[in-house]
Amino acid sequence: DVASLTHDTAYFHALKNIWENMAGKKLYITGGIGSRAQGEGFGPNYELHNHQAYCETCAAIANVYWNQRMFLATGDAKYIDIVERAMYNGVIAGVSLSGDKFFYDNPLASMGQHERQKWFGCACCPGNITRFMPSIPNYVYATQGHDIFMNLYVQRHSSINTNSNTVEIRQTTSYPWEGKVELTVNPDKQEKFAIRLRVPGWVKSTPVPSDMYAF
């Protein structure tokens, strides 16, 4: 935010360097980050244990926040690839289907001893995920001038304000279980504008925007 508001290229250059190191050397396939419990932070490059993975729920949420801001500053869809991966995997794993038990850390493998808890002595993750989930609609679209960026594919009916129009968009889809997405677009007034559809990286066998993983 500071880099965007002040137009300070030094800030943004530093952010891009840190991001490239994270996306290329320190990102779990789930979109989780932070391999070490000590200091709740990153370890050396490629330190991505399964059983010992820390991947705090709060860190996955922060990864969404960070990549959303990077997208808003650049318009580059690669950042939304990480938003989507972290949201569907690293974040949502942090809460049970019943909504009353939580993971603080999210290892990728367990001998059965790692279970969600009702609360923690340091209960940052339950509150953070409870705050985050109602905000998910804010990540579906973005605008620039007359144009609309469709970043996430979800079953949703939205009214989007651009610089000169209000556009209703209805997405009909079972994504992520099925890839088909139907769009109904209804602008308040006739004018030319673009809807920029994100092509997810995983469609091109690039699940994250680096050479870390391929399938």
Description of each model-found segment:
Residues 1-215:
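Glycan-recognition and catalytic cores of secretory/periplasmic carbohydrate-active enzymes
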